[in-house]
Amino acid sequence: MNITKHAFERMRERGFTVEMLGKILRMKTIRRGPSKEEGSSRIVAKVDGSYWTLIVTDDMKTLITVRRAHEDEEQEAREG
């Protein structure tokens, strides 16, 4: 997966590692939802004990940004 400069900077700021990204991408089931921006999707997943939100291109080739999941996103992910 390609990582934008913006995403790389956010990863560094927020303590999200390339290894954590790999763990999410290797999950058997990745639930994607719509994002506010056209052409992108939102992935919410738990990795290393915390829930994270990844914004990726619809083709899953590029990570646009990453942040800790909001409370409602975390709840959605728990309910599956």
Place the predicted regions along the sequence by residue.
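Ribonuclease/tRNase effector modules and their secretory precursors
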Residues: 1-80
